[in-house]
Amino acid sequence: MSPSTSSKGKSSGLNQHYEEKVRPCIDLVDSLRSLGVEKDLNLPAIAVIGDQSSGKSSVLEALSGVALPRGTGIVTRCPLVLKLKKISKDNNWHQWHGLMSYRDQTKKLKDPAEIENAVLKAQTVLAGTGEGISHEMITLEIQSSDVPDLTLIDLPGIARVATGNQPKDIEKQIKDLIEKYIKRQETISLVVVPANIDIATTEALQMASKVDSTGQRTLGILTKPDLVDKGMEETVVRTVNNQVIQLKKGYMIVKCRGQQDINEKLDLVEALEKERHFFDEHAHFRSLLEEGKATIPLLAERLTKELVEHITKTLPQLQKQLEMKLEKTTEDLRALGAGVPTDEHEKNNFLIAKIRQFIDALEGIKKAEEDLRSSDMRVFTKIRKEFDRWKTVLDAKTIKTEETLRDEVEEYVGTRRGRELPGFVNYRTFENIVKKHIEELEEPALKLLKDVTDIVHSCVNRIVSSHFKAFSHLLRATKDPIEDFLDEQFQKAEEKIHSQFKMERIVYSQDHLYSNKLDTVKQNLKVLGQRPFISAEVREMAQHLTAYFMITSDHLANQVPLIVQYHILDQYISQLQNAMLAMIGRNNPGMLLQEDSDVARKRRELKERLERLKSAGKVLSKFVHSV
């Protein structure tokens, strides 16, 4: 069997095997891409990359059967999605059909000769009149009996140096665009490399290797085999046979139309015959044809097979991606809330509903029942931690008092003893020591007030922002009472704490409480330790002081938190709730509900994304149930 016969046999068998599977798989991804979900999901794709003048455009031209822009410099200035759809030969009306779309424009093409100018015009619209590039996509769909079932994404050729009107950083711009596509695990990189150069030096192969170090997603295509220097043919053969730089998907080699062929008006059909003849007659490259590694027709079959297998392989992950994006988009849209109605009556009801939701959220704080979706810990849990710290301060003070009382009492007795006989406790000394220690606790109590106020303030601000962030006027109208009422309640709580400590400096306790506590202290031999040489009067006073401080500590451990909670939580929240209810009848709903343009835009984008994802879900579901 001759090489050409062998090639035809392979083609026929492959088409029969894949005929029922190929088009639905490729149509699935094309449908998803046409819905615009490529903004949201990583779709399976084959991206064609190569250095400038690598022959990339010629390969695509040969695969599609139409002349694409070619020449020196940057020819491809935008990503070009090339959708090739094979149709039946007996349908004359659909013998050839072209459709180009970009942004919101669509153009039907009746003749293959129109394509080159149509692509150039589209690139000018998207990338400007200079030589810059754009990330915006052009889609070119071709239906013909002479094309394979295949979709490719053509990316700009890599420029090493900016020339002419090109931006100074053109190399970086192009590489960033290419990397955006090829770094995705869902993308197969089709790397086009001239056969007459050292492939290790090509930027395209280096870029592919950077994001796909094992070559799992990379297929190498060698071009321009007719330009290989004599003596280098075996190196090319070794490269195609994966013996130089190894890729899991390997290499293929093709010969496309050169400039001389174009000048001589060699059409694409004749070019394919010329290519087959070249490999058939070549002493070194004939073996590559026999092994199915050469010519455009075999490359087309290989790419179709690779794409179908890749789509099938990535489908479960695509479904998972879609579900996650749907959930996230739905949640984001819910967080933004519904848009403002246009009817004035409905607008008023909308405002009432928004304010009541806010009031309910405030009530949740007060009752320690708030929604935890926006926070990892309830406000009252944080406040309780502050109350516990206050109790720790009191306990530490009591322990410190026990340790230092001896010296303090001795100092007072030694310097301030009056006419009392030995053994009599000086009550004035007792009072002075009590007042001194009580004063030292006032500052930590005020710090507790400030810390709890900060917690409540932060929480209320977070809640008001989550409810009203879309409405700047309503947000501002709410901010004033938030600050004013909090300042008011803070001052009231502060005054009460000052008053509380003034009262604590008045030494008093119920007799039975004091006596019971004193008995406990006297029974505890650790109060003053077993320190020798301590006088009876010092021991006696120290025991009385310790007993009194324990009573005071228990009292303050509850009283200060009650003052703080009453004013900063209960009174403040209630005052704020009443002010919000009063706002309903006092203000113009239309003015309060003027929505920020950024929020409206974001809601619109989220709604559009949700619709895209839902449509994509239907397409995916239909495909899964049909196979």
Curated annotation (Swiss-Prot):
Its main location: cytoplasm. Coiled coil: none annotated. Residues 255-258 are annotated as: G5 motif. The keyword Cytoplasm applies. Residues 223-226 are annotated as: G4 motif. PANTHER family: DYNAMIN (PTHR11566), INTERFERON-INDUCED GTP-BINDING PROTEIN MXC-RELATED (PTHR11566:SF199). This is Interferon-induced GTP-binding protein Mx.
